[in-house]
Design a protein with these regions (language model features):
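N-terminal leader/linker segments that precede catalytic domains of diphosphate-processing enzymes
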Residues: 1-52, 57-112, 143-189
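NUDIX/MutT-family hydrolases
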Residues: 117-159
Length: 189
């Protein structure tokens, strides 16, 4: 995946939504790619106990959304911005219930890394191999009724952790991009 966009980015209207940015941190461990996720603490305002990417609300001091994602990652798990190689900005997403407009950035981080987790925000770190998100047997799709409307929800189960909501949608989108890039490479060979 390169920083150059080979597909049109989908941006969402932000009216009435809180703008936030997240980092999708990818690292190599034991010869396989992994993604760093966090388990939110019970002390945060939104998404308590859920599995998410490091990230948060755009701050007035943030020059841009990428800086927001890197700042929040530093605050939550202690990864220095200089240690992240940002590869791409993905499509915008939103959270259904809490009304966040989320802009994800994919970045490579070194491994091993000495994380400094903020206990007020983060209860723990989860680092599933990226491969599980390519395996249809590891995912399920449910239809939830939200405000009287059906909403499709993809979720992944890994080592007892339920990865769902915007986090699962972002991971599913990342997998689709990687698969389409691999398919494009096969066609060009």
């Amino acid at each position: 995946m390169s920083a150059r966009r080979r597909y049109p980015k989908i941006s969402l209207p932000v009216d009435g939504l809180v703008t936030a940015a997240v980092l999708v941190p990818i690292f190599q461990k034991n010869g396989a790619l992994h993604v760093l996720l966090t388990k939110r603490s019970d002390m945060v305002e939104h998404h308590r106990g859920e599995i998410s990417f490091p990230g948060g609300k755009l701050d007035l001091t943030d020059p841009d959304l990428k800086s927001c994602a890197l700042r929040e990652t530093l605050e939550e798990v202690g990864i220095l911005p200089a240690d992240v190689k940002v590869l791409a900005e993905l499509d915008d997403f939103y959270t259904v219930a809490t009304r966040f407009h989320v802009v994800p950035f994919v970045g490579l981080i070194p491994h091993p890394y000495e994380y400094h987790v903020s206990p007020r925000e983060i209860a723990g770190i989860v680092d599933p191999p990226l491969d599980i998100f390519f395996d249809p047997s590891k995912s399920r799709e449910d239809t939830w009724i939200f405000r009287g409307e059906p909403v499709k929800m993809t979720s992944y189960l890994w080592e007892g952790h339920n990865i769902w909501g915007a986090t699962a949608r972002i991971l599913k989108h990342l997998v689709e991009l990687i698969e389409s890039k691999e398919h494009e490479n096969e066609l060009n060979d």
